[in-house]
Amino acid sequence: MKRFFTLALFLTLYVLSLKAQSSDNGDGTFTNPVIWADCPDPDVIRVGEDFYFVSTTMHLMPGAPVMHSKDLVNWEIVSYIFDRIEETPRYSLQEGTVYGRGQWATSLRYHNGRFYAYFTPNDQPYKGYVYTTEDPRGKWELHSVIPHFHDASFFFDEDGRAYMVYGTGMIRELKPDLTGVLEGGLDTKLFERDKEENNLLEGSRMIKKDGRYYLLMISWPRGGIRREVCYRADRIEGPYEKKVILETPFGGLGDGVAQGTIFDDPQGNWYGMFFQDRGGVGRVPHLMPCTWIDGWPMLGDKDGKVPEIMEKPVQGQERKALTVSDEFDTEALGLCW
């Protein structure tokens, strides 16, 4: 009887622990934040029926974790894009430190059968790194070192041309082999910010839908909350028009939900993944619907709010959590470390 009670108690605690670590409610719904962990600057892409999510690790290495999911709710780490940054001794705690700096805001794309990732250290050596792989669960290879582009978004157009969209509406065309900038290629500012955009405006993510170009950015006007804005144009060089697509607090906190990206599922439904700054907890991602209204990707529910509880986009997937218990009884550390 004692043994049975002990086993029952263990199973109960295990289930409760898993529930606490996962946003999956077990009834076909999930609760936002979809990941209760520090996963800043999310970029999410879909390849077939698989979703991939890359985030920021700053000074921690290996860096730029790649996560995989079948339902956008249950995620697992499958690889890291890079092992170390070696161009400055500060990344090895020599001649100073890089705490709070390092790798920021990776852009993840799938193009012609390969995955590409671009990131810049928010510190020396002020370069940009392009990594690539055919298998996101395997090893990523350094493809090229190109200029530093702040909070950049890779963009591959249908005509084969490649671009980097970065900063506050800047764009630079790249060589077709992604080894540097294309001399004589497109190099311009896509728009001038209006008077309402009087503070932070960054976190570029560009997509193309139905022949239109959409540039999503985080905006943080003075005296306001973080919000997401969208610039759209019929030509990549513009002219662009702007619309606020998400501006709402969440969870009783005064800060808004913004900076991330939008994507579709195999059935053509659209979603957004954007973070909210939770202070010491970090920047936690929230999953929400994205509804196209008059050619604009409007985020949140019908009232423009981030839903607290939402139906999972895909049903029937195994519940998983990024945070795990580890007995350290294997030869290699788990990817969570």
Describe the role of every protein-language-model region.
Residues 20-337:
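Carbohydrate-active catalytic/glycan-binding domains of CAZyme proteins
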Residues 1-22:
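Bacterial Sec-dependent N-terminal signal peptides
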